[in-house]
Amino acid sequence: MTFRYRGPSPKGDQPKAIAGLVEALRDGERFVTLLGATGTGKTVTMAKVIEALGRPALVLAPNKILAAQLAAEFRELFPENAVEYFISYYDYYQPEAYVPGKDLYIEKDASINPEIERLRHSTTRSLLTRRDVIVVASVSAIYGLGDPREYRARNLVVERGKPYPREVLLERLLELGYQRNDIDLSPGRFRAKGEVLEIFPAYETEPIRVELFGDEVERISQVHPVTGERLRELPGFVLFPATHYLSPEGLEEILKEIEKELWERVRYFEERGEVLYAQRLKERTLYDLEMLRVMGTCPGVENYARYFTGKAPGEPPYTLLDYFPEDFLVFLDESHVTVPQLQGMYRGDYARKKTLVDYGFRLPSALDNRPLRFEEFLERVSQVVFVSATPGPFELAHSGRVVEQIIRPTGLLDPLVRVKPTENQILDLMEGIRERAARGERTLVTVLTVRMAEELTSFLVEHGIRARYLHHELDAFERQALIRDLRLGHYDCLVGINLLREGLDIPEVSLVAILDADKEGFLRSERSLIQTIGRAARNARGEVWLYADRVSEAMQRAIEETNRRRALQEAYNLEHGITPETVRKEVRAVIRPEGYEEAPLEADLSGEDLRERIAELELAMWQAAEALDFERAARLRDEIRALEARLQGVRAPEPVPGGRKRKRR
């Protein structure tokens, strides 16, 4: 099936950018950059390129929130095609770790989200059965996954009228990782009552009922997951595994190989007098081997993935990329963030696992259960489109062509940029804030330190300006509530340090003030300045004031680039008779889980809004877990559960005090 785009017709710079990208990719350019200004509709451009080329596509986003937003947009643009969402399936994740200085072992603790797990299986099923597939993914796409050849080869084909003895069918379901549960039928499970089998594919939302007559399949139908009502008749179906890590045939041979590595490593420790490490490794690994023999799996089975997938030591693991056909296309959204993220994933994972191996918690082969190195990622992709308003050095150095998308479909211009002296800057700033407040507009102010932000906010409030500080410790709910209050006019000015994070594209903001603009560094680099300037690009009166005693090189380049874009936009509007208008964007209510900071419920949200809030909290929880701030991660997990309960219309679960209890062994 071909891709069928059902979105708005391209406008502004979109047609030119689409044609440029398609031409470059058809000419065989391996790396191409789409340099698209904020608000120019880069998603529509990506969609039209995918439609024109007709190739499966992977769109990588830097975090779960942006991935969810992109997936929703692509589903609207391609309602007849397979748009899949592939992120980590953990609601709560605490990686296995060891802190030698404290002799503290932290066992892996995780809570899997069954809906996200279903979406992951839906992704791999789609990739193996059709070509009209767009996968929107997070960095989870470069982490280990099962062997796609095994996943494809082990599927089960059931057809009406064909012989299939009941016991053979049950045995095959167990081989594919499906669990029997005659009470609770959910994705990845099946139940059997007499000659009726009900199977819930791991990637579907509705189970399949198979009715046997003796050894023959008499009837196949799809049924309602709750009522059991027959929805439609099926001539047959293909069932893919319920797990990406299948126990291969010849399991005993694999276990012998693991045991061989174990005794070599035990001997290594004993020769160095590290008896404790040897004993620890022996106990843990023998326990895992026994679990694998009896149950076919064990906690942390992914650490033995090298043996199960037949990979050689040091060889890259199978990942989602291996499920794509060879000619697939990759888009790296917000590439100035995504590229460094891809470059850094391997090193962080290796450092944590190396400690576990060195102290006898894991075999050296566990190091092969890892994300891809950046160079390995590039080896697996044939063509990449970098998408960003401010492409990084890697993108610009390697791209055979840079395609610009400067003109917005709305006709809005990049904001006016003015450099102002630091003398009396606060008084000048207050005058600007008051002027905009009188017109019903808002102001964003960015400073360099927490102390400066706190002192400036206090000073503004003391002088009658309704200002708030966007504190770095605010969680997702408080942050969204603060932005909502700004948009509703409860206050007129928001002071912050890093205004580059998502969620700050506020149409009511007509002034962005950057203090200490000439202090070069991460938040005052050319790329950061252009991104911050873009925060005023959704208002027709948008202005940016740079307070500085001198014009730094970064400032000069950012101003020149903004002025260049603005000149192009003005010329286009003049030629086409377009009058820019401020973006109209609905102000969404913010909801908090019950008992959260004793805050009252503000308003009921739609299911889509609730899911967006949950995605934001999941991102914060991951970040807390990666920073080893497990108390905060546990609190965020409880908040997520409360929101999910509200989404499902049930009573919120009780929070787990202090997180889950952890066992040692």
UniProtKB/Swiss-Prot annotation:
Gene Ontology annotations of biological process type: nucleotide-excision repair; SOS response
**Domain Helicase C-terminal: from-to ranges:** 425-591
Q: Where in the cell is it found?
A: Cytoplasm
Annotated ranges, domain UVR: 611-646
Q: Which InterPro entries match?
A: Helicase/UvrB_N, Helicase_ATP-bd, Helicase_C-like, P-loop_NTPase, UVR_dom, UVR_dom_sf, UvrB, UvrB_inter
**What does the record give under GO molecular function?**
ATP binding; ATP hydrolysis activity; DNA binding; excinuclease ABC activity
Database matches in Pfam families: Helicase_C (PF00271), ResIII (PF04851), UVR (PF02151), UvrB (PF12344), UvrB_inter (PF17757)
Arranged from A to Z, the UniProt key words for this protein are: ATP-binding, Cytoplasm, DNA damage, DNA excision, DNA repair, Excision nuclease, Nucleotide-binding, SOS response
Residues annotated as binding ATP: 36-43
Short motif (Beta-hairpin): ranges: 89-112
Its cellular-component GO annotations read: cytoplasm; excinuclease repair complex
Where does the Helicase ATP-binding domain start and stop, copy by copy?
Answer: 23-408
Q: What is known of its domains?
A: The beta-hairpin motif is involved in DNA binding.
Additional remarks: The ATPase activity is stimulated by single-stranded DNA. UvrB is stable up to 80 Celsius degrees.
Report the sequence similarity comment from the record: Belongs to the UvrB family.
Q: Name the job this protein performs.
A: The UvrABC repair system catalyzes the recognition and processing of DNA lesions. A damage recognition complex composed of 2 UvrA and 2 UvrB subunits scans DNA for abnormalities. Upon binding of the UvrA(2)B(2) complex to a putative damaged site, the DNA wraps around one UvrB monomer. DNA wrap is dependent on ATP binding by UvrB and probably causes local melting of the DNA helix, facilitating insertion of UvrB beta-hairpin between the DNA strands. Then UvrB probes one DNA strand for the presence of a lesion.
Subunit composition and interactions: Forms a heterotetramer with UvrA during the search for lesions. Interacts with UvrC in an incision complex.
* Entry-linked PANTHER family: UVRABC SYSTEM PROTEIN B
Q: What is this protein called?
A: UvrABC system protein B
Q: What taxonomic lineage is listed for the species of origin?
A: Bacteria, Thermotogati, Deinococcota, Deinococci, Thermales
